[in-house]
UniProtKB/Swiss-Prot annotation:
Source organism: Escherichia coli O81 (strain ED1a)
Stated name of the protein: N-acetylmuramic acid 6-phosphate etherase
Entry's EC annotation: 4.2.1.126
UniProt-listed GO biological process terms: 1,6-anhydro-N-acetyl-beta-muramic acid catabolic process; amino sugar catabolic process; N-acetylmuramic acid catabolic process; peptidoglycan turnover
SIS domain: residues covered: 55-218
MF annotations from Gene Ontology: carbohydrate derivative binding; carbon-oxygen lyase activity; ether hydrolase activity
Biological pathway: Amino-sugar metabolism; 1,6-anhydro-N-acetylmuramate degradation; Amino-sugar metabolism; N-acetylmuramate degradation; Cell wall biogenesis; peptidoglycan recycling
Lineage of the species this protein comes from: Bacteria, Pseudomonadati, Pseudomonadota, Gammaproteobacteria, Enterobacterales
UniProt cross-references to Gene3D superfamilies, sorted A to Z: 1.10.8.1080, Glucose-6-phosphate isomerase like protein, domain 1
InterPro entries reported in the protein's UniProt record: Etherase_MurQ (IPR005488), Glucokinase_regulatory_CS (IPR005486), MURQ/GCKR (IPR040190), SIS_dom (IPR001347), SIS_dom_sf (IPR046348)
Induction remarks: Induced by MurNAc 6-phosphate that releases the repressor MurR from the DNA. Repressed by MurR in the absence of MurNAc 6-phosphate.
Listed PROSITE patterns: GCKR (PS01272), SIS (PS51464)
Note from the entry: A lyase-type mechanism (elimination/hydration) is suggested for the cleavage of the lactyl ether bond of MurNAc 6-phosphate, with the formation of an alpha,beta-unsaturated aldehyde intermediate with (E)-stereochemistry, followed by the syn addition of water to give product.
């Protein structure tokens, strides 16, 4: 697909005079365009749901969720991956973010990195990609060689693959087994796909990782019950989570957390089933770490 024919490279009539308006009007134009992004994502919810189910199945079988992208797309993948361990208590290697050009490219532009097909393949080889893994290729344009080659290599290995782009009929969409294509239209600044396209990608990634964690028992109700208390804010959040899940007071919640080495799930089961820490942990282990299953009457 030729670059000039891509929707993400089109000219947006709503912002044609944006360099001549007041600062407030400039903000209104950008905001009005941003409002269209969730609607574009809404139109592809069935595709997102299908991808979540596949990702969950693979991760449940011992696989990993791997994001692959260049520039803004790569950085968004890294951002999503890096938030999973503290939020959901998973090991750092379960959700992986790879970016064309490597770690240096997180903060700097690396010329030619996104055009390297070899780079996409080598980065996946370097993390020991296996058929159990799911590779999610992210590219607003849908034409990034680094991402396309990575998806091709992943499929050759037998991996399940997902392609996220904002141009229908793109190479990324056709290469991946599952395509997620929120069409957000032309950007406020022509071709600046870090804006609406990047926002759409972030919303999709939020759903993929959050959906995976919910289906993996990392959420009880709407509480992040595997959160790791790495700072004072999260320490307080743990107490509030146990309080909200059980109806106990702060002192009881803190006592339960101390008794089980600050594991919210265990503390919740301790309080609700009147068990000690070891008994509660054993009960959770017997039910795959799912609180709801652990609370069901035998």
């Amino acid at each position: 697909m030729q670059l000039e024919k891509m929707i993400t490279e089109g000219s947006n009539a709503a912002s044609a005079e944006i360099d001549r308006v007041s600062t407030l009007e400039m903000c209104r134009i950008i905001n009005d365009e941003d409002k269209t992004v969730p609607l574009a994502v809404e139109r592809v919810l069935p595709d997102i749901a299908a991808a979540i189910d596949v990702i969950h199945a693979q991760v449940s079988g011992g696989g990993r969720l791997i994001y692959l992208g260049a520039g803004t797309s790569g950085r968004l993948g890294i951002l999503d991956a890096s938030e999973c361990p503290p939020t959901y208590g998973v090991k750092p290697g379960l959700v992986v973010g790879l970016i064309a050009g490597g770690e240096y490219a997180i903060q700097h532009a690396v010329e030619g990195a996104e055009d390297s097909r070899e780079g996409g393949v080598n980065d996946l080889k370097n993390i020991g990609l296996t058929a159990q893994d799911v590779v999610v290729g992210i590219a607003a344009s849908g034409r990034t060689p680094y991402v396309i080659a990575g998806l091709e290599y992943a499929r050759q290995l037998g991996c399940r693959t997902v392609g996220i782009s904002c141009n229908p009929g793109s190479a990324v969409s056709s290469t991946a087994e599952f395509a997620i294509t929120p069409v957000v239209g032309a950007e406020v600044v022509t071709g600046s796909s870090r804006m609406k396209a990047g926002t759409a990608q972030k919303l999709v990634l939020n759903m993929l990782s959050t959906g995976l964690m919910i289906k993996s028992g990392k959420v009880f109700g709407n509480l992040m019950v595997d959160v790791v208390a790495t700072n004072e804010k999260l320490h307080v959040r743990q107490v509030n989570i146990v309080k909200n899940a059980t109806g106990c007071n702060a002192e009881q919640a803190e006592a339960a957390l101390i008794a089980c080495e600050r594991n919210c799930k265990t503390a919740i089961v301790m309080v609700l089933k009147n068990l000690d820490a070891d008994e509660a942990k054993k009960c959770l282990d017997q039910h795959g770490g799912f609180i709801r299953k652990a609370l069901e009457k035998e």
